[in-house]
């Protein structure tokens, strides 16, 4: 399995084949994977990008190349080990289980909540900053922009979280899927970008998910 950063870079290298689309159902069953209005580029958003990296699925083996969304849903999800003594669930079952509980971890807010509830959340330093805590491959979560904050609060989006990125090798930056919130082609044609974390604002939560499902600090029992 490729590491998180190594996997994330394969999408950056193929960013011109992708288009950022915030539709809430990217990489979901029944979704249209390709954007027929924009040269059939693969649709991607911030959280689907993070899930692909966590699963160690490089671009060349992803549904964007194979066209096999169902195959993606049958993949084992090792970072979600399930309760002790049970086999590792597939990513499809993980998504479905949390969606049924109203905690859709396919989205950034649901994944952030999952990280807090199951021991993956990082503790900031005494000043409340994550700057000295972050390591490459960590996840950073951000609150909705001021123009949309009221909307996120109204719909009770957990912590009003609207975006997630992956901390890059230079920990001042994150690699993330980003772009216009509207369904349109990016002017710069870069669905995957390196963004200075400080330019996005202070993360409201950071987490470290190891691909084998451990936190590195304590043994976590996860109920399925």
Residue ranges and their predicted role:
Residues 1-91, 145-151, 159:
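N-terminal capping segments
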Residues 13, 21-23, 99, 105, ...:
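Intrinsically disordered, low-complexity sequence elements enriched in Ser/Thr/Gly/Pro
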Residues 27, 86, 108-109, 195-198, ...:
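Small/flexible residues
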Residues 67-77, 82, 95-96, 116-131, ...:
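Aromatic- and glycine-rich peptidoglycan recognition patches
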Residues 88-125:
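Short, structured beta-strand/loop micro-motifs enriched in basic residues and often containing a Trp
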Residues 135-139:
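Structural motif
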